[in-house]
Amino acid sequence: MKKPLILFLITAGLVLLLDQFTKFYVASHFWLHESLPVIDGFFNITYIRNPGAAFGFLAGAPLLFRGLFFTSVTLIAAGLILFYLIKNRVSDLMMVIPLALVLAGAMGNLVDRIRFGEVIDFLDVYIGRYHWPAFNIADTAISIGVLFLVVDMIQKQKEKS
């Protein structure tokens, strides 16, 4: 169990550092709402502050409620991830890495909420006429982690059949 736990902690730590570094860089080098085209018509770096969650969920709720809600949900999720990892002595890389990604992403956004009362987003994608809401490294880590967990569950379900 030691090696998977060390890998989990290193992965989560590196992703959290990358998330916080990129947010710090964008916040210190861009004006709020400033946008830099990277791939014209497809991908921009745009400095946004999001008081809500994905797609602006709870953005209009009072600051105290948002803070308590998002902090509680994040800490409960983090506790459940760590409990699951340790109790089940998870050693499968298809579980260790995705769980580390989800934890790091959740913690990265929690750090922003505690520091600023909102999350720094800056990855801005357009697909044709569709504009995806801006997101960050933490959101990406959570999405990739969940995707890998779902793929792993589907594969394990197929093996049982």
UniProtKB/Swiss-Prot annotation:
It comes from the Bacteria. It is a multi-pass membrane protein. The keyword Cell membrane applies. One of its GO terms (molecular function) is aspartic-type endopeptidase activity. The keyword Protease applies. The chain crosses the membrane at residues 6-26, 67-87, 90-110, 134-154. The active site is at D121, D139. It is found in: Cell inner membrane. Its EC number is 3.4.23.36. PROSITE patterns: SPASE_II. GO terms for biological process: proteolysis. Keywords: Aspartyl protease, Cell inner membrane, Cell membrane, Hydrolase, Membrane, Protease, Transmembrane, Transmembrane helix. Disulfide bonds: none annotated. One of its GO terms (cellular component) is plasma membrane. It catalyses: Release of signal peptides from bacterial membrane prolipoproteins. Hydrolyzes -Xaa-Yaa-Zaa-|-(S,diacylglyceryl)Cys-, in which Xaa is hydrophobic (preferably Leu), and Yaa (Ala or Ser) and Zaa (Gly or Ala) have small, neutral side chains. Pathway: Protein modification; lipoprotein biosynthesis (signal peptide cleavage). This protein specifically catalyzes the removal of signal peptides from prolipoproteins. Belongs to the peptidase A8 family. This is Lipoprotein signal peptidase. It comes from Syntrophus aciditrophicus (strain SB).
